[in-house]
Amino acid sequence: MVILVLNCGSSSIKYQVIDMEDASSKLLAKGIVERIGLPEGDLTHKPVGKEPFELHQPIPDHTTGIKLVLDALTDPAHGVIASLDEVKAVGHRVAHGGEFFPESCIVTEDVKAKIRSLFEIAPLHNPANLEGVLSIEKVLPGVKQVTVFDTSFHQSIPAVNYMYALPHAYYEKYRVRKYGFHGTSHKYVAKVGAELAGLDFHNSRIITCHIGNGGSVTAILNGKSYDTSMGFSPLDGLVMGTRCGQVDASAITFIGEKEGMSYAELNTMMNKKSGVQGLTDISSDMRDIDRAYDEGNPRAILARDMYYARIKKFIGEYAAEMGGVDMIIFTGGVGENSCEMREAVCTGLEFMGVKFDPAANKGARGVNKILSAADSKVKVATIATNEELVIATDTYNLVK
């Protein structure tokens, strides 16, 4: 069964085409549409076993972008399917499912209405995610669609961990609580990591660290999310590329009063101008921070130390919550590729039973590999995440 997986952003569409069977999957193509709504848009199409294809032209909206993707998939030279009739279902990544969606589901009018109702608490992501669904309805009418939510895996978090100590009326009226994100990735790498380490996913204590430009740490107890570092929005928790992470709210209101900043301006400052970018005024990319660190830049040294320390802090917190830990997993763009970060975070965790193996860690990038010594009580691994495969799998299981 050929499944199209879409991840629609405000000005981009990431996609993969995967041929799914009960016990196997085969990637046929992947690509990205960028600069939607700008004067010059881009399509980069990468079919497996064929030459990549690029297109540069105005792409006014998501519907136009998806049409270009479908044209590329059936192109005689660069395509991977003979006809669009081969596409049996489309799976969508949706950032926020609120309390409505504890698992993936087939798209209905009710599902679309609930995604729309969450626009105000996920204004950067949900509108674009829904636009992808509506665009497919226009260009592939009748094809079944499935939504897979970043928040679903975290719906198992108990109230003691998801509630904020605010007046309860705000939860009743607005559902203000911790939701958590990156759930699709956390669940996938925990399952793969448990298998790699010979652990029972449903009878284990796993801490997953999804570290990229955005990042979160999750405590997984007996196969279910028990706590996670992101909160009501993806702003909370770790120091990130441009996001501040955990901070005293009074510091923000103080800055707002002193600078005469609106709520919108404060929100932009915390989400777009903070993190390692704000600390260094150099970059939001940890590779640039690493170079500045090596050159002795004091602000880069502070930023990287804070970045690593916050990850370690959540690992310690979640080990305490679960009464110990059996495995720590690193994933995401930084988690999969930064040997320095993994070693720095694990150094000092010997008291928890972590015995890190620097030799195994060296050069381990984008692979699934155990990074702890054979006699380490706590297993450590890097696992390459594959959210698109999870979306395709959920889609296949719901529509087959």
How does the language model describe each region?
Residues 72-87, 193-200, 315-326:
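Phosphate/pyrophosphate-binding loops at sites that engage ATP/ADP/AMP, CoA/4′-phosphopantetheine
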Residues 301, 305-321, 326-329, 335-400:
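Internal helix-turn-beta structural module
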Residues 221, 226-262, 268, 332-363:
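Catalytic phosphate/nucleotide-handling subdomain of diverse soluble enzymes
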Residues 268, 275-279, 286-321:
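Adenine-nucleotide phosphate-binding core of ATP-dependent small-molecule kinases
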Residues 9, 92-96, 211, 325, ...:
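Glycine-rich beta-strand-to-loop/alpha-helix junction loops that act as flexible
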